[in-house]
Amino acid sequence: MNPIFETYFTRFEAFEQQSQKPVDRNLGIIVTIPCYHEPDILQTLNCLWNCTMPSCHIEVIIVVNHSETADNSIKQFNQKTFEQLCEYSSAKSTGTISFLPLAAFNISKKQAGVGYARKLAMDEAVHRFAQIDNPEGVIVSCDADTIVDKNYFIEIETFYRNNPQCSAANIYFEHPLTGDLQQGQYQAIAQYELYLRYYVEQLKRIGFPYAFHTIGSCFSVRAKTYCRQGGMNKRQAGEDFYFLQKLFPAECFGEINITTVHPSSRQSDRVPFGTGTAIAELKQSRQELMTYSTESFNILQDFFVRSKSLQNASEQEIRDTYESLHPCLKKFLPSSDFEQKIIEIQHNTKTHEQFCKRFFRWFNGLQVYKFLNFSCGNGFQKIPIGTAAKELFDKTDMDIFSLLQFYRLRAKKENKE
């Protein structure tokens, strides 16, 4: 067995192998899908089955899961779903794509959730690649209510073949804005996606080096990289955010934007937060989604500029820099923490590039998010997403849908450059 697989299985809390199904020697991409009380899973699988196939073999691992405390109706629904998936696998698996349903039923209440199911699926993908000694194999994270473009597999394969230095990548996404749902629901999802894109654009503007989306249905990672970073966590929600925050500073991260993933626009209560929950809350409140003001981001921008100049600074210069920071940031970040961390970074780096990289490993995406929330209670109120998105690029004449289209086009253009 390749040492990187062996290390992962022995050092980290990896799940044991679930399936004894033979592995195709040409296996190159594995799509992993958590599935909980999901009525549209066959629509997602049919979409994957209808994609143009790449040169490598494809596997799709679906983990049907529920907690030991789930309602009997959900348990019965999931049991029926699993049986349907087994029948689907027998009928639809071919020489180019195969489906592998797994059942994770009656998980302990403490562990049950999408993180558990996603980790089980991704760990199984590692076991599959380990059997054919393919550490370069690509694990794709998807969701059970997601649709993808026909060139999905082709573009994933092409990206990793043409970018051997890249260890992981996001896949461009757009939520559906038309269809059979109520107009209010599409209004809500447009606000939510605009919120996500506004946030990333602000991160880019202020010089944060890891300005990427963190969406569970839209990322991919090489098997060796997944292992190197300790694998997925079992969080009941937000598992994608925390996993990707580990990847961004440690690996070469790219973006695949020639194909598109279409996450569901429906409301849901399956996880404590996320797309479905946000849509439900917006519909119920009938208010505009609120976001962080440009002023809050500007405080971070100034902080980053000042901190990046401290590679060779004396202790007094570090203290002086701290005193020059915005009062809100100083309230968030105690002087002793800042000084100790900068000195530690100085002692462990030799070049400015190393200094900056280590600095942003410390003040990472989670720290940014925490500060922005902190600032909202300390003088910087949130503002409506429509107002914020208009002000950032001076687009005062646009409605929510036009703004979202502008931000989408901008994201695609930036990713190409």
Each predicted region: which residue ranges?
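Terminal low-complexity segments of carbohydrate-biosynthetic enzymes
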Residues: 1, 280-417
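Short, acidic, metal-binding catalytic loop of nucleotide-sugar glycosyltransferases
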Residues: 25, 46-59, 66-70, 77, ...
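Active-site-proximal specificity loops/subdomain of glycosyltransferases
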Residues: 71-136
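Acidic donor-binding/catalytic loop of UDP-sugar-dependent glycosyltransferases
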Residues: 123, 133-137, 141-159
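Conserved donor NDP-sugar-binding/catalytic core segment of glycosyltransferases
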Residues: 150-189
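A recurrent flexible, glycine/aromatic-enriched loop bordering the glycosyltransferase active site
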Residues: 200-220
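Catalytic donor-sugar/metal-binding loop of nucleotide-sugar-dependent glycosyltransferases
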Residues: 235, 247-262
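Acidic donor-binding loop at a coil-to-helix junction in glycosyltransferase catalytic cores
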Residues: 235-242
